[in-house]
C-alpha cells in the first residue's frame, strides 16, 4: 500500500509492503509484488497510467473528486470484487445521511464562500466546487463565489478579484504540511492589508479547516466535514 501522510492504517494492513506515497509509488516494488490490479485516484491518472502500463500491470483510476464519484466507485468495486451487498450498505448509509442533512437547512439562506487551499512553500490556490472541499461546501449549502471553475478543481485568482466578490465566509485548508501552511496563512492575512478590507475578515468569519476532513480526495470522514461546515455556515441559526 502507499504510505498515508497523516491517516492511521488499519491493523490488518500494517504489515503490508510499503510502496511509497500515492503520487510517486515505487514501481520496482509494485512490479515484484505482481498485483492483479492497482487502484489509484483519477487525479493521478495522467502521472501514473503510463508507468503502470510500463510494468504491465492493470490499473483502475477511481473518481475521488467528490462524494458522488466516490460512491459510484464503491458501487463499481462492489461489482468487481463480488462485494455488492457490502457496497450497497455503504451507499444506502450515504444517501440516508445526505437526505437527513439537507432537510435541516433546505430553507436557509446560502452564505457566499471563498475557499483557499494552502500549498507547502508559501502559496495557495482557490478551491472551486469541482474540488473535493468545494463539493463538501456545496453539499453543506454554501455558495462558492467562483462556482465550479469551469470544471477546474483549483484556480489562481488575485486577492483584488476575491475582494470584489466579497465573500461572507473565508475557509482555509491545506494540501499537505498543515502546521506550516496555516502559519503561512496567518502571515499572509496579517501582512497583506488587502485582506483587512474583506467583510469576512472584519466580521471574524475566517475559519481554518482540518485537512484530515478537508483535503484533496473524498473519504469516509465526510460526515465530520459536513458537521464542521454546519457549525460554520449556520452558526446563527
Feature roles, as predicted:
Residues 71-74, 79, 88, 92, ...:
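Structured C-terminal subdomain patch of bacterial secreted/periplasmic proteins
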Residues 130-153, 172, 208:
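His/Asp/Glu-enriched short active-site or ligand-binding loop at hydrolase and phosphoryl-transfer sites
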Residues 27-34, 54-55, 157-166:
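Short helices/loops that flank or line small-molecule/ion binding pockets
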Residues 1-33, 37-43, 145:
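A short, structured surface patch at a secondary-structure boundary
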Residues 86-141:
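Basic- and aromatic-lined ligand-binding clefts that recognize polyanionic substrates
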Residues 9-10, 44-76, 80:
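Flexible loop/hinge segments that line or gate small-molecule binding clefts
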Residues 47, 63-76, 110-132, 178-180:
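Extracytoplasmic ligand-binding site segments that recognize negatively charged/polar headgroups
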Residues 33-38, 142, 165-170:
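Alpha-to-beta junction loops
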Amino acid at each position: 500500500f502507499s504510505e498515508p501522510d497523516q491517516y492511521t492504517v488499519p491493523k490488518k494492513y500494517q504489515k503490508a509492503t510499503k510502496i511509497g506515497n500515492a503520487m510517486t509509488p515505487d514501481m520496482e516494488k509494485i512490479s515484484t509484488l505482481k498485483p492483479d490490479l492497482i487502484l489509484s485516484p483519477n487525479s493521478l491518472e495522467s502521472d501514473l497510467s503510463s508507468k503502470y502500463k510500463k510494468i504491465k500491470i492493470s490499473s483502475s483510476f477511481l473518481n475521488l473528486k467528490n462524494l458522488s464519484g466516490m460512491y459510484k466507485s464503491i458501487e463499481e468495486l462492489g461489482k468487481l470484487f463480488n462485494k455488492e451487498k457490502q457496497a450497497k450498505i455503504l451507499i444506502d448509509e450515504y444517501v440516508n445521511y445526505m437526505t437527513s442533512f439537507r432537510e435541516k437547512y433546505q430553507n436557509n439562506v446560502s452564505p457566499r464562500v471563498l475557499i483557499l487551499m494552502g500549498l507547502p512553500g508559501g502559496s495557495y490556490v482557490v478551491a472551486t466546487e469541482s474540488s473535493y472541499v468545494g463539493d463538501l461546501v456545496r453539499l453543506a449549502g454554501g455558495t462558492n463565489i467562483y462556482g465550479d471553475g469551469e470544471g477546474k478543481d483549483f484556480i489562481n485568482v488575485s486577492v483584488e478579484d476575491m475582494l470584489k466578490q466579497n465573500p461572507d465566509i473565508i475557509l482555509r485548508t491545506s494540501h499537505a504540511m498543515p502546521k506550516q501552511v496555516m502559519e503561512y496563512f496567518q502571515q499572509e492575512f496579517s501582512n497583506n492589508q488587502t485582506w483587512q478590507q474583506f467583510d469576512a475578515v472584519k466580521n471574524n468569519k475566517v475559519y481554518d479547516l482540518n485537512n484530515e476532513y478537508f483535503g484533496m480526495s473524498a473519504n469516509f470522514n465526510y460526515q465530520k466535514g459536513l458537521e464542521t461546515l454546519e457549525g460554520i455556515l449556520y452558526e446563527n441559526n
